[in-house]
Amino acid sequence: LKEQFPDINAFNQEFGLDYWSNRVNKWEDFPDIRGTINQSLAAEFQKFQRKLVTDFLSWQASIVKEYKRPDQFITQNFDYAWTDHSIGYQPEVDQYDAACCMTVAGCDIYHPSRDKLTGAEITVCGNISRSLKKDNYLVLETEAQGNIDWLPYPGQLRLQAYSHIANGSNSVMYWHWHSIHNAIESYWKGVLSHDFSENETYQEACVIGNEWKRIGSHLKNIKKTNHVAVLLDNASLTGLSHFPLATTARHSYNLVMRSLCDALYRLNIEFDMVSSRERNFSSYECLIVPALYSAPEDLLYALESYVKDGGHLITTYRSAFSDEHLKI
């Protein structure tokens, strides 16, 4: 904040700290923001935390780059916002920034199965991963037998595997090989159960592997040229977690985003994800902007220019409410 605001009075003004006598007169008096009533401060601290993740991963990657062979790559398992399965954009990491130091993006995608399998989680989460490097990605973890009530019907494991590949993944790796015998994931079942015996999940994984031995060269590096994109924004995700919709609480942003993405999926309209740090959207015929609660002026101007140049913009309620510091 000191780097952003050399004048502490400007900082107080931007963050509305005269309210309820929260004014900070010296940086040395800066308060602990835990439990703050000022959501602008809380959001700024969460932004700082996301930067710490980016800096840490970049530091790790720089060490690995010193020693890795030219044919080796660097990846990272980026996960997603979570209810009882993967639902959308991760609030605690700016994945677009953090992925810059990676060679290839990696992810884990977990979702309901059996009668509750929709395919939408594979698509939405996969689209996020594909967008991080604007390239193919790796599914570093996904379910085998999975969580309680997730044991796939015969043929579903294969269906899910091909869905990942069709979305642009170059791998499907299962968590995990055999079911563990202790701790919190004791019943998060792997390919094998606790008895290490062959089962239907193992046999179906063998079918998938044998098929990919034959045709895998035709499945890797599948590319897409989509005409529709959905814009993702960490700041708005954070903002709506502090000022949530009445019916969706802390997952407000992701549930608004998913309502749009799931509709596209049901209509069989393929789409990319794009970061809110981008300013040129001209490669897309339609740009969908869910709940852009927090936005700097230059992003709003970029969206306006996109429309003036012939683009079709779809946005929702709770968009353009506040600036990048949650100031309305």
Range-by-range predicted roles:
Residues 27-30, 58, 70-71, 99-328:
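Carbohydrate-binding surfaces of carbohydrate-active enzymes
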Residues 1-104, 108-122:
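Polysaccharide-binding and catalytic clefts of secreted carbohydrate-active enzymes
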